[in-house]
Amino acid sequence: QEASDRKYYRIKADNVSYVLADNFDKTDQSANFLYASKILKNSSVNVPEVLAFSEDLRFLLLQDLGDKSLDTDKEFKAEKILEMALEQLSKIYFSDQDVLRSATKESLLIQTNSFIDFCKENKLSNDELKALENLRNNLVQNLLNQQFIPTHNDFERRNLMMFEENLFVIDFQDLNMGPIGIDLASIMYEHSYEYPKVLIDDLLEKHLKNNGLKASSEELKNMIMHALAHRSMRIVGAFNKYFKEGKLLNRKSDLDKFLKRIHLALSTLKKDEAKIVKKLLCCLLYTSDAA
């Protein structure tokens, strides 16, 4: 089950297994999924087959890709997973751009509104809140200056599955034109995995050459760090909102991991606001210990 209230069921007919997605009244998500699926398949991205859907788009019948979600499966080495993931990401880049909506300054700023709410709830001073407000505006400005390409927006291991020795991409309904750093930050600096710097550097160098991207290695790393800070702020804010609604409580332990990702990004970029995030981390850990 997803935070969006979407539910998945595995069903069998004639000894063949399928996945039934129930989107309840969120039929706009179903429409986006179907649209993105067609775009990605046309670009040879491995995505599950859509076999049928109800007239009102509440239900989607999908190909069953099994249970090897790459955020839990330990069979595959990190280097192999990242290489295969970047191969699929390269194919996403070559999706039809003309039919995709584009991220805007407004949409990117909205994504981190809830992070400021989280900071207010954790008793930061007015000066600290003002500094973070300026920071999120600066992050968005950097993102807007990046090369815009087709973007999954949540390109991490839990949205990648291994099926018949091929890596498949799922949950791609938010596909749009976005900053190049977003998907690379998602997969290379995922909250639960610490990859060796030499591996990240090597893979990013190859990724640059293979895709003819308009950046040097250092410029790309800078873009990724700005995207990592923004993405992690978005997720911290979203988690905090879900927790207050009684949703995703099993992921409370991930909150500090995303704060650490914000701190990593800001420290790498030599941003003074890293100290404020460090304070948030200390407050969160103290609260957890007290509980």
PLM regions with names:
Residues Y9-K105:
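ATP-binding pocket architecture of kinase catalytic cores
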Residues P48, D73-N126, Q146-F148, N176-M177, ...:
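A cross-family kinase active-site recognition segment
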Residues R6-I11, I92, N137-I182, E194:
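Active-site acidic catalytic loop and adjacent metal/ATP-binding pocket
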Residues N113-N122, I180-K214, H226-K247, F258-L266:
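Active-site activation/catalytic loop segments of kinase-like enzymes and analogous catalytic loops
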Residues Q1:
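Protein kinase glycine-rich loop
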Residues L281-L284:
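Eukaryote-biased recognition of C-terminal alpha-helical segments
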Residues S102-E106, S216-L228, S253:
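All-alpha amphipathic helical-bundle segments outside canonical DNA-binding/catalytic cores
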Residues Y286-A291:
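Conserved small/polar residues in nucleotide/adenosyl-binding loops
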